């Protein structure tokens, strides 16, 4: 059997995602579609609006054959690390190819950009360093350098929806993987578009509908399975500000153990993943213990520190994701199965003897490996309880979803 991979968050799953699944099966001619999905936290530095098991069920009903979880360390990483974790997971699962959404289906140009970033020629590096010296954030500086170095790829470089596409290809090329890649031209609203007039709304736009209680519009854009999960859920939607109390308490605790010394406070914060000394100092200066997460992030962001990075840093503090953990994730430590159908079961049976890392189907047998992800899920469940008074099942009580 031949498998093709999709990397997703399905936050939440909408009709545009189904379009991608159908195109993936058509383009790749795969027998099996494997989805590597973020769990309860997503790459923007936010909680998923609904838990990973509900999203897994909806994904399987919409056409996925297997859903595995992207470990939270990767799920809350930069685009580069997010893509690396997902691509390496698909490689471990013997996927022959990967399909991803982009604003172009020009795979050659996407690969050209990826190779430029990997090779870092002296000319490209000089342009990049100059842009960084001018105070641009790294993503903005890289875009500036690529535009000057590869003017023929201008439209692709400036497309925000191409960032992850480039990172997926980069991960494949950098790791010398034998994996074919297929960009799928996006249809409908873009990733950050909140329009509700396109045939396919963006997940961002749908989250805004959820936040505004515009449930009457949801049925138009969500898959039937996702709409049913959200309608019947006692634990959604969840948003970043629902974690504000947890964040403020955590920051106050760190400050207290530093004896309210701002220098020590900043040094402690800089131990967390992706928090530079500059970001740590900005956190210390902005922190009052009274802001919600959105207000705090808006205070801290700057010209060269983008909002989504600040949100990830906040989640790293909440979830105890530290720089010292990075060595444990140089390679995929395990693969955790969230759900499958009959086709997926057949595929898993065909590859199980070829897997090089633990393939987790029963969480109770891998408590040591999953202890960190368990803790993250418990924090998600705590936010649900504080908002809705609903007690979610813990990870040992949850069953794999079978369709």
UniProtKB/Swiss-Prot annotation:
Transmembrane segments: none annotated. It comes from Lachnospira eligens (strain ATCC 27750 / DSM 3376 / VPI C15-48 / C15-B4). Its EC number is 6.3.4.-. The keyword Cytoplasm applies. GO terms for cellular component: cytoplasm. Belongs to the TmcAL family. It is found in: Cytoplasm. It comes from the Bacteria. It catalyses: cytidine(34) in elongator tRNA(Met) + acetate + ATP = N(4)-acetylcytidine(34) in elongator tRNA(Met) + AMP + diphosphate. ATP binds at residues 7-20, 101, 161, 186. This is tRNA(Met) cytidine acetate ligase. Catalyzes the formation of N(4)-acetylcytidine (ac(4)C) at the wobble position of elongator tRNA(Met), using acetate and ATP as substrates. First activates an acetate ion to form acetyladenylate (Ac-AMP) and then transfers the acetyl group to tRNA to form ac(4)C34. Keywords: ATP-binding, Cytoplasm, Ligase, Nucleotide-binding, RNA-binding, tRNA processing, tRNA-binding. One of its GO terms (molecular function) is tRNA binding. GO terms for biological process: tRNA modification. Pfam families: HIGH_NTase1. It is an enzyme of class 6 (ligase).
